[in-house]
């Protein structure tokens, strides 16, 4: 087991994750854009002055990602650039010339998360009626997320003779269809409320977990790495494909491991429901506050195809006191290598454990809060004709990413 190989795999996961965030477009900038017809997706209390209908699959396509770490936390300026011949301008946080405090400063001491959503509006329409504004939507959606503990990055940066309790590593992805019915109305001059009922039709959900990951490197003569790996897949007609191999030790017989997947047919595998709730309150002519809770609900899946590793520990105690051939009373090098190979086969490979039955997942929920400030100023120009300038600023907080966005626009 080569630690450098492990570190490269961890870096690949981190770079792939943050790259998804770098390519994303955020819809939050449209939160206070009055002419944006799909603001009700951010807060169901919002309506429109006009009726509308979108072009199927082209009316609204959105990609959103949220996270508490980014590309700049993984890839950094190389302190040896221009100092050492051949040094590249950029390097990773694992570079030995970058201090541990600087390398790990951008990562949360809890879980480091990136989540994302892709939404394609197959049909969307809005119209006035029933005392308010109504929306009907048919959407194709995909969501994904990954959670990496701080200790994982600490292990990658400071691999040495220490004990590391890394914790749980989790990733998931889900694809589903959505039928959403929304209604909003003005309660009084100051308050507007809205709600949206969503029917969810599950296509597929995948969850990959490595639980209780630990690395004990304190002993000079033995390294121990442990983790319980598990993959769960809910999808109609899905199954794991396995291959049979023989252990290096003939006395252990054969083992099976997952090397491919197969989908026989297609269709819906899950059903769920969710609601959006939102409100907007006008304090006075200058201040307006609003809040929304989105995707509060669940998804129930009819199957759960599971695969897991057979052995949750890998022990490496070196190649000391080895003989090349039998006869000197010591363990033979080839036999020791075969033992490690068999141990790794059980630790690193997944085995099909069949359908575990139905399961229910909580739908990922988030909420947003915002406020809008509008101020007017009377100004005279050279012709002494009055001009009214309106400055509007907004502050939006999205609880999925714990960051504030400040935007403003000027209209003459």
Please report, for each region that a protein language model flagged, where it lies by residue.
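Short, solvent-exposed beta-strand-terminating loops
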Residues: 58-89, 138-152, 205-214, 298-310, ...
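Bacterial N-terminal signal peptides that target proteins for export
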Residues: 2-11
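N-terminal cofactor/phosphate-binding cores enriched in small/glycine residues
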Residues: 15
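Outer-membrane beta-barrel porins/channels
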Residues: 153-412
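N-terminal, post-signal peptide beta-strand-biased segments of exported outer-membrane/organellar beta-barrel
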Residues: 6, 22-142
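Conserved short hydrophobic patches within well-ordered secondary structure
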Residues: 2, 120, 386-387
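Hydrophobic alpha-helical hairpins/lids featuring a short glycine-rich hinge
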Residues: 118-146, 172-198
């Amino acid at each position: 087991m080569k630690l450098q190989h492990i570190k490269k795999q961890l870096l690949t996961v981190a770079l792939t994750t943050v790259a998804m965030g770098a390519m994303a477009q955020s819809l939050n900038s449209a939160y206070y854009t009055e002419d944006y017809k799909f603001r009700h997706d951010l807060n169901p209390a919002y309506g429109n002055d006009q009726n509308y209908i979108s072009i199927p699959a082209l009316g609204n396509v959105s990609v959103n990602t949220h996270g508490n770490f980014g590309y700049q936390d993984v890839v950094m300026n190389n302190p040896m650039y221009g100092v050492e011949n051949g040094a590249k301008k950029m390097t990773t946080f694992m570079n030995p010339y970058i201090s541990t405090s600087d390398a790990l400063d951008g990562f949360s001491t809890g879980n480091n998360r990136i989540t994302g959503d892709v939404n394609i509006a197959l049909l969307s329409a809005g119209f006035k009626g029933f005392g308010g504004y109504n929306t009907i939507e048919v959407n194709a959606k995909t969501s994904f997320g990954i959670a990496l503990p701080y200790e994982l990055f600490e292990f990658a940066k400071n691999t040495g003779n220490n004990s590391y309790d890394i914790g749980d590593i989790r990733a998931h992805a889900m694809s589903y269809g959505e039928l959403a019915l929304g209604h909003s109305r003005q309660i009084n001059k100051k308050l507007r409320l809205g709600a949206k009922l969503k029917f969810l039709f599950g296509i597929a959900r995948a969850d990959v977990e490595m639980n209780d990951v630990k690395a004990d490197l304190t002993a000079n003569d033995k390294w121990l790495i442990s983790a319980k790996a598990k993959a769960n897949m809910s999808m109609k007609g899905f199954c794991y494909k396995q291959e049979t191999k023989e252990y290096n030790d003939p006395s252990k017989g054969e083992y099976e491991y997952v090397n491919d997947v197969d989908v026989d047919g297609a269709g819906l595998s899950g059903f769920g429901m969710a609601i959006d709730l939102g409100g907007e309150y006008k304090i006075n002519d200058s201040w307006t506050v609003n809040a929304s809770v989105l995707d509060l609900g669940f998804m129930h899946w009819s199957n759960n195809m599971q695969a897991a590793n057979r052995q949750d520990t890998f022990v490496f105690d070196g190649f000391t006191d080895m003989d090349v051939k039998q006869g000197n009373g010591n363990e033979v090098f080839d036999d020791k290598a075969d033992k490690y190979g068999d141990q790794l086969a059980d630790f690193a490979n997944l085995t099909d454990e069949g359908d575990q039955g139905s399961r229910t997942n909580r739908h990922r929920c988030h909420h947003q809060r915002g406020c809008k400030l509008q101020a007017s100023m009377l100004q005279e120009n050279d012709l002494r004709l009055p001009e009214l300038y309106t400055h509007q600023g907004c502050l939006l907080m999205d609880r999925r990413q714990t960051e504030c966005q400040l935007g403003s626009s000027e209209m003459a």
